[in-house]
Amino acid sequence: MNWRSERIWIELITGSRKISNFCWACILFLGSLGFLLVGTSSYLGRNLISLFPSQQIIFFPQGIVMSFYGIAGLFISSYLWCTISWNVGSGYDRFDRKEGVVCIFRWGFPGINRRIFLRFLMRDIQSIRMEVKEGLYSRRVLYMEIRGQGAIPLTRTDENLTPREIEQKAAESAYFLRVPIEVF
């Protein structure tokens, strides 16, 4: 969702609360829970899951390995659920032509740097840079080149934008900020 007028442009950034992250967290949780239950069933010698006959799985070495994979999967799943609940990566980009200021805000992991807030003047923006890598793992990322600060990404690296979408976004950003576009 974006909001735009002649002088102010606010672009909301979606963080980790995406449908794909919810799906992966659920799949990983259920799969690792199944592994842990089968490993525990082989240790106890009775079925905790009626779908799988776990008496056929001996505890050493198959049951231990399945329990290990189940515990590891639960840790990774809890990490995913934490990033979803904290909404890591969400925020906004605000371009204010009236005050001549650009503000970039993102939520991070809990701690000292939970709130990431960057603020700089529009006159320090040198260009909008488009980085395009084609191939098996194609990548299209839009950067804002800032004098003395380097390049700050405006799009996420996991966003699969089409060439037309990235060009349109680069053109809109460059037009609003009145800076040139560079392509790498």
UniProtKB/Swiss-Prot annotation:
GO BP: photosynthesis
Places the protein is found: Plastid, Chloroplast thylakoid membrane
Keywords: Chloroplast, Membrane, Photosynthesis, Plastid, Thylakoid, Transmembrane, Transmembrane helix
Disulfide bonding pattern of the chain: none
Main location: plastid
Any one of the GO CC terms: chloroplast thylakoid membrane
Record carries keyword Thylakoid: yes
Keyword Glycoprotein applies: no
Membrane topology, from the record: Multi-pass membrane protein
Residues annotated as transmembrane: 19-39, 57-77
UniProt xrefs under PANTHER family: PHOTOSYSTEM I ASSEMBLY PROTEIN YCF4, PTHR33288
Family: Belongs to the Ycf4 family.
Function (record text): Seems to be required for the assembly of the photosystem I complex.
Name of the protein this chain belongs to: Photosystem I assembly protein Ycf4
Species of provenance: Drimys granadensis
Lineage: Eukaryota, Viridiplantae, Streptophyta, Embryophyta, Tracheophyta
Gene responsible for this protein: ycf4
